[in-house]
């Protein structure tokens, strides 16, 4: 079981605080000037697929060593063992945390409550494979005898963000003749606009809800069912066009779905980690089951690296402790994930959920309020779009924003010199953020342009870049199912490590519940014309204004 250790009370934390104070004026430029081989010392490569360069960070060898010592002191090794062995480390829900078992391609036994879960995991995978084969071969036909051409995944949170992100990232691997669509928002616009794009005769809906009671998902599912029956006019045809990713067989059957087309998963699979489970069916249908298996395999490879590698060379651990350094010692409040690959445009949003839902906690594993920072704000957009939007603040603003830059060495679309131009920006941005531009350089540039110092004195301060902004550069040989699996697992395990260090429970999400409870109480009040007075004056005023306007 996870130990309950307040990180701020450890020896390593105290030593890191001393090091932070002693290195208050540390400059990335000085670190490189003092060590021309810094890149070699502060980069790691994984299986010729990923290169992680963390040399452009505000860390010395001594700081790095103490950060790893912090991981040792909070018993990260024991926590890793507890995760992979099926211990119930999700204590508040009394559950194991075993998304790693879903991608356990070595098929070694994994036990929960004395039962090896791998036979059930493999059975669901085989069922998914058979289902994909039927759809892709045209054997599965709609109510008019036509083959399926469109998949509509109806879910929310992990049942939507993950599958959408992966199918977008792996669009070059899309099965010909199959288009995927994703509906999540309970705003009727989302389902209406999606249904306008598809044909009821050739569309297969996947309803992704473990309990089959999720409000947003079931509202959209019933609207899709009603839309479908407006054309099909026979409820028995629902079974030809709907499948379920759920464990509630009774509710699935009542909806009209054949329970043989219900794909189950387990309570030890968290929603934000569920792409590795039956929730990944939309991925498998979109990119092909063989490619889905390669995705699983890539994640398993990173899991093995994480489980077996010493901390000094362990990529998720390294990224995690660097994040702790900025979050808890430098006072950084956010981290940016910046993929230089258009297919990866939803990757930052996916790990916005993955990180903030996991580590956005203010209570430690002892049930006490923490007096230190936990999870950071995660955000980002693809490059180079972000360069023309928010990079200004990262370069010259007043906030420290550590950034992860991600780019593939090889493009799926090698058009002209597009990729060289993209990568030139990828390389240039981390260099600019680290080293900046001095006043002397700015003055020399103006002089070369024939300007006198007097003419441009008012401009010079605005053109100086202080630099010293930390980044990690993650170079991928190519975005493939394998490397994407590795990247996702890398970030997942980074999040786990940080949760262990911060002494919080990373696998519950009670913060999601309160708003849902209150919405359930408010909904009946919206069905009457009467003014409400049962809330605070702000909420009453908003509800009553809505009633007057609707």
UniProtKB/Swiss-Prot annotation:
The active site is at 357 (proton donor), 388, 516. Disulfide bonds: none annotated. One of its GO terms (cellular component) is cytosol. It comes from the Bacteria. Its EC number is 5.3.1.9. Keywords: Cytoplasm, Gluconeogenesis, Glycolysis, Isomerase. It is found in: Cytoplasm. Catalyzes the reversible isomerization of glucose-6-phosphate to fructose-6-phosphate. NCBIfam families: PRK00179.1 (NF001211). Belongs to the GPI family. This is Glucose-6-phosphate isomerase. It comes from Psychromonas ingrahamii (strain DSM 17664 / CCUG 51855 / 37).
């Amino acid at each position: 079981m996870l130990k309950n250790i307040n990180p701020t009370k450890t020896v390593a934390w105290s030593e890191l605080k001393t090091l932070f104070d002693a290195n208050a004026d540390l400059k990335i430029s000085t670190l490189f000037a003092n060590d021309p081989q810094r890149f070699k010392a502060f980069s790691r490569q994984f299986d010729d697929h990923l290169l992680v360069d963390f040399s452009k960070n505000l860390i010395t060898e001594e700081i790095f060593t103490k950060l790893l010592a912090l991981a040792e002191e909070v018993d990260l090794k024991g926590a890793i063992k507890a995760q992979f062995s099926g211990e119930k480390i999700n204590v508040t829900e009394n559950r194991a945390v075993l998304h790693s078992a879903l991608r356990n391609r070595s098929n070694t036994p994994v036990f929960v409550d004395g039962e090896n879960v791998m036979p059930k995991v493999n059975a669901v995978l085989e069922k998914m494979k058979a289902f994909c084969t039927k759809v892709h071969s045209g054997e599965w036909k709609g109510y008019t005898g036509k083959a399926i051409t469109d998949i509509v995944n109806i879910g929310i949170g992990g049942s939507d963000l993950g599958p959408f992100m992966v199918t977008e990232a792996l669009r070059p691997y899309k099965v010909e003749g199959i288009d995927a669509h994703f509906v999540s928002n309970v705003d009727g616009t989302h389902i209406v606009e999606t249904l306008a794009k598809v044909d009821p005769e050739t569309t297969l809906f996947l309803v992704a809800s473990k309990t089959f009671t999720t409000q947003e998902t079931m509202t959209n599912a019933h609207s899709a069912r009603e839309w479908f029956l407006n054309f099909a006019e026979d409820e028995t045809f629902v079974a030809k066009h709907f499948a379920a990713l759920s464990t509630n067989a009774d509710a699935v059957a009542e909806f009209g779905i054949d329970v043989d087309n219900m794909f189950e998963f387990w309570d030890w699979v968290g929603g934000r980690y569920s792409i590795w489970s039956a929730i990944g069916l939309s991925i498998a249908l979109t990119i092909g089951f063989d490619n889905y298996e390669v995705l699983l395999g890539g994640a398993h490879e990173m899991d093995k690296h994480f489980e077996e590698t010493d901390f000094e060379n362990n990529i998720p651990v390294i990224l995690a402790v660097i994040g702790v350094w900025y979050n808890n010692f430098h006072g950084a409040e956010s981290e940016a994930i910046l993929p230089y690959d258009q297919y990866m445009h939803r990757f930052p949003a996916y790990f916005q959920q993955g990180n903030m839902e996991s580590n956005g906690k203010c209570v430690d594993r002892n049930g006490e309020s923490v007096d230190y920072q936990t999870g950071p704000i995660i955000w980002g957009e693809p490059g180079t779009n972000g360069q023309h939007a928010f990079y200004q603040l990262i370069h010259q603003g007043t906030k420290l924003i550590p950034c992860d830059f991600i780019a593939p060495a090889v493009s799926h679309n090698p058009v002209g010199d597009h990729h060289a131009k993209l990568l030139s920006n990828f390389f240039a941005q981390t260099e600019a953020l680290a080293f900046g531009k001095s006043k002397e350089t700015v003055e020399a540039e103006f002089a070369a342009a024939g300007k006198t110092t007097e003419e441009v004195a008012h401009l010079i301060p605005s053109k100086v870049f202080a630099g010293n902004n930390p980044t990690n550069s993650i170079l991928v040989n190519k975005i493939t199912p394998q490397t994407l699996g590795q990247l996702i697992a890398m970030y997942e395990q980074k999040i786990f490590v940080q949760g262990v260090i911060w002494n919080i429970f990373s696998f519950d999400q009670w913060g999601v519940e309160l708003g849902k409870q209150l919405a359930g109480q408010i909904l009946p009040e919206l069905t009457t014309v009467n003014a409400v007075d049962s809330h605070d004056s702000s909420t009453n005023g908003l509800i009553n204004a809505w009633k007057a306007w609707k």
